UniProtKB/Swiss-Prot annotation:
Keywords annotated in UniProt: Chylomicron, Glycoprotein, HDL, LDL, Lipid degradation, Lipid metabolism, Lipid transport, Lipoprotein, Secreted, Sialic acid, Signal, Transport, VLDL
Role description: Component of chylomicrons, very low-density lipoproteins (VLDL), low-density lipoproteins (LDL), and high-density lipoproteins (HDL) in plasma. Plays an important role in lipoprotein metabolism as an activator of lipoprotein lipase. Both proapolipoprotein C-II and apolipoprotein C-II can activate lipoprotein lipase.
Protein known as: Apolipoprotein C-II
Signal peptide, first to last residue: 1-22
Protein modification: Proapolipoprotein C-II is synthesized as a sialic acid containing glycoprotein which is subsequently desialylated prior to its proteolytic processing. Proapolipoprotein C-II, the major form found in plasma undergoes proteolytic cleavage of its N-terminal hexapeptide to generate apolipoprotein C-II, which occurs as the minor form in plasma.
Keyword check for Ion transport: no
Lineage, broadest ranks: Eukaryota, Metazoa, Chordata, Craniata, Vertebrata
Gene Ontology MF, one: phospholipase binding
Family: Belongs to the apolipoprotein C2 family.
GO biological process, one term: lipid catabolic process
Annotated spans, Lipoprotein lipase cofactor: 78-101
TM region(s), chain numbering: none
């Protein structure tokens, strides 16, 4: 999965680079035309929105309720076990530090 994210990131940066290079516009007044940074930022936000909606659509398409329930169940069991053992460890540590009194 890491290679997919890296590939998507490289492609997005490549498209942004091509868009910035290919946008040769005649010089206009600085006050009327947005700066290059603003154009790049707007372009990035546009691509980010498209990628975000595509990822959300893919997530909704592949969402499995049984897997979600299993993950929640495993999380609940593991947090209960960790809190139990953390309590035992804390009690042991306090009794070692306090000593016999």
């Amino acid at each position: 999965m890491g290679i997919r994210y890296l590939l998507v990131l490289v492609l997005v940066l490549l498209v942004l680079g091509c868009e910035v290079q290919g946008a040769h516009m005649p010089q206009q007044d600085e006050a009327t035309s947005p700066s290059l940074f603003t154009q790049m930022q707007e372009s990035f936000y546009g691509y980010w929105g498209i990628a975000k909606s595509a990822a959300q659509g893919l997530y909704e398409k592949t969402y499995l309720t049984t897997v979600d329930e299993k993950i929640r169940e495993i999380y609940n069991k593991s947090t209960a076990a960790v809190s139990t053992y953390a309590g035992i460890f804390t009690d042991q540590l306090l009794s070692m530090l306090k000593g016999d009194q």
